[in-house]
């Protein structure tokens, strides 16, 4: 399909997280967080590299202790992906991480402590050119805000963020981004909509503690989708109680669905019914597994019968329409050849890879021309 996205992104100030631009006209960055023990350097490095292979732009790493800060330094030396140090409670850990090297510091207004501690972090970040993320979370609001509002509300999240933004402003520090996360979709969306009109800094989106793989993916798709449709959001994290790689995959699927960023294959597949001329579900599962390594944006239609098959296949780069006795393959929107069921997956995979390689050559040539 060639319907253009109607989304007009919110204007925001651009910052750099390592070599990755965030905000402005930069692509929306997709990030995740390690769930290894940070002091286990080898395991953490391995997970970061796996996330990088999955397409992560940025990875956040929890740094709960000084020992973890030293481990973080070793991790940073072994990876190329920008790393965000996740700091809670002890501002001195942030100072140490800034000293040993980090691409961004995440601090939580609800537990980082007094203003003088925030000032110390700002000073260290300014000296090293490190951006800060003000990461507000509904589950850890300041005690006075909990008392004032009685419970987490969008207004409480925004007030928490604005307090710390005021501190940054008074110290002439504009190199920051903001997040306001809750596990409730409506609270999160309302908070982001409020603050989007008050500041020009980039916004990092997320539904915190969203749930397991299925429920968390759905909740995140709805919440982030609502904000992204409004043009709000410069970087996203899909929080799942699952393999962090799934966070990256779901994140890209959300952006792909809204035509905000393309990576890998966009499958158009029917849910199957008794009219199918091949096993659609089995074929789709096999193709997705085999083609995970392809990063080139490509539309692939997999439709089990001739009701909608030809129409969908004509709009895709490569299409498969079920038929009897043979299935019809479309290339570039036109019927090309037929395939029998016994050779379907292998031959169709080969065709998709060939088409992806050709398209990547075209994209590379365009980039080379500038």
Swiss-Prot record:
Q: Does Cell cycle appear among the keywords?
A: no
Question: What is this enzyme's catalytic activity, as reactions?
Answer: (2E)-4-hydroxy-3-methylbut-2-enyl diphosphate + oxidized [flavodoxin] + H2O + 2 H(+) = 2-C-methyl-D-erythritol 2,4-cyclic diphosphate + reduced [flavodoxin]
The GO terms describing molecular function are: 4 iron, 4 sulfur cluster binding; 4-hydroxy-3-methylbut-2-en-1-yl diphosphate synthase activity (ferredoxin); 4-hydroxy-3-methylbut-2-enyl-diphosphate synthase activity (flavodoxin); iron ion binding
Q: Where on the tree of life does the source sit, at the highest rank? A: Bacteria
Q: Where does [4Fe-4S] cluster bind?
A: 270, 273, 305, 312
InterPro entries in the record, alphabetically?
Answer: Dihydropteroate_synth-like_sf, IspG_bac, IspG_bac-typ, NO2/SO3_Rdtase_4Fe4S_sf
Q: List this protein's GO terms for biological process.
A: isopentenyl diphosphate biosynthetic process, methylerythritol 4-phosphate pathway; terpenoid biosynthetic process
Question: Which cofactors is this protein said to need?
Answer: [4Fe-4S] cluster
Q: What is its EC number?
A: 1.17.7.3
Keywords (alphabetical) are: 4Fe-4S, Iron, Iron-sulfur, Isoprene biosynthesis, Metal-binding, Oxidoreductase
How is the co-factor bound, per the entry? Binds 1 [4Fe-4S] cluster.
Name the pathway it acts in.
Answer: Isoprenoid biosynthesis; isopentenyl diphosphate biosynthesis via DXP pathway; isopentenyl diphosphate from 1-deoxy-D-xylulose 5-phosphate: step 5/6
**Sequence similarity:** Belongs to the IspG family.
HAMAP family in the record, alphabetically? IspG
Record's function text: Converts 2C-methyl-D-erythritol 2,4-cyclodiphosphate (ME-2,4cPP) into 1-hydroxy-2-methyl-2-(E)-butenyl 4-diphosphate.
Q: What is this protein called?
A: 4-hydroxy-3-methylbut-2-en-1-yl diphosphate synthase (flavodoxin)
Q: What is the lineage of its organism?
A: Bacteria, Pseudomonadati, Pseudomonadota, Gammaproteobacteria, Oceanospirillales
Name of the encoding gene:
ispG
């Amino acid at each position: 399909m060639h319907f253009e996205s109607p989304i007009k992104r919110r204007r925001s100030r651009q910052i750099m997280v390592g070599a990755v631009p965030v905000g402005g006209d930069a692509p929306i960055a997709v990030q995740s967080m390690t769930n290894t023990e940070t002091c286990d350097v080898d395991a953490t490095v391995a997970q970061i590299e796996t996330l990088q292979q999955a397409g992560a732009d940025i990875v956040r790493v929890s740094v709960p202790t000084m020992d973890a800060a030293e481990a973080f330094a070793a991790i940073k030396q072994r990876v190329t992906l920008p790393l965000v140090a996740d700091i809670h409670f002890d501002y001195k850990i942030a100072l140490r991480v800034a000293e040993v090297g980090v691409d961004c510091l995440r601090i939580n207004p609800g537990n980082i402590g007094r203003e003088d501690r925030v000032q110390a972090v700002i000073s260290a970040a300014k000296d090293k050119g490190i951006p800060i993320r003000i990461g507000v979370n509904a589950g850890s609001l300041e005690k006075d805000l909990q008392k004032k509002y009685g419970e987490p509300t969008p207004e409480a999240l925004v007030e928490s963020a604005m307090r710390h933004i005021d501190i940054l402003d008074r110290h002439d520090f504009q190199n920051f981004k903001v997040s306001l996360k809750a596990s409730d979709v409506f609270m999160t969306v309302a908070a982001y909509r409020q603050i989007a009109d008050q500041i020009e800094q980039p916004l990092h989106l997320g539904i915190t503690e969203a749930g397991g793989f299925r429920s968390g993916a759905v909740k995140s798709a709805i919440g982030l989708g609502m904000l992204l449709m409004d043009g709000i959001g410069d970087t996203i994290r899909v929080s799942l109680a699952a393999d962090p790689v799934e966070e990256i995959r779901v994140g890209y699927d959300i952006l792909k669905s809204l035509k905000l960023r393309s990576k890998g294959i966009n499958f158009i597949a029917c849910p199957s019914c008794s009219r199918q001329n091949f096993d659609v579900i089995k074929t789709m599962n096999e193709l997705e597994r085999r083609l995970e390594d392809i990063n080139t944006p490509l539309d692939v239609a997999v439709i089990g019968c001739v009701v909608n098959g030809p129409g969908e296949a004509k709009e895709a780069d490569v299409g498969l329409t079920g038929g009897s006795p043979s299935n019809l393959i479309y290339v570039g929107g036109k019927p090309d050849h037929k395939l029998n069921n016994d050779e379907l997956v292998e031959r169709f995979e080969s065709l998709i890879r060939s088409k992806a390689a050709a398209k990547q050559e075209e994209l590379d040539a365009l980039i080379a021309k500038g």
